[in-house]
């Protein structure tokens, strides 16, 4: 694995680093290396933690597991393997059914997903694209199923992970073993990857799978080459 652009600090380097580590040990079962990288500038790490807590707070029908599923789809759309693995790990810990995680790219047709799920995921994936892909039709379907506050929660997850996607892909953050195991379990069962290939950014087969899934859901207007 390539050396990250900036090496993460040790969890015991400061009192604040230890406190943040304790929080993530509870939510993920480990502390992400990305947090220890942010700790080179503690205000950034603190602001991120507060934003994370605010975004993941549930005030409506969007559950904790749904938010992690949104994060998974958003991160896979943008191509961030690190965040994708973390989202799968968190979705498992917050109660996402295995059936949903295994079939999430077929959410348009799979019986594990409701019409409101489909509207939610359409919005999340379209919002994750650059240029932005949120159409008037996608907006109308989202408004049909969700309140303004719930739409804010959905897009809050997309925006939060947009920051993380760019941070971790640019930093080359080293993926932690628990996250690797969670993600490989899901994608290996779908025969999308073989062991040890998931987080190789040059994995053309995986990127092709993403492209095909998005095209099948008619969320890309044109083919996208990888």
Task: Please tell me what each predicted stretch does.
Residues 1-226:
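Hydrophobic alpha-helical segments
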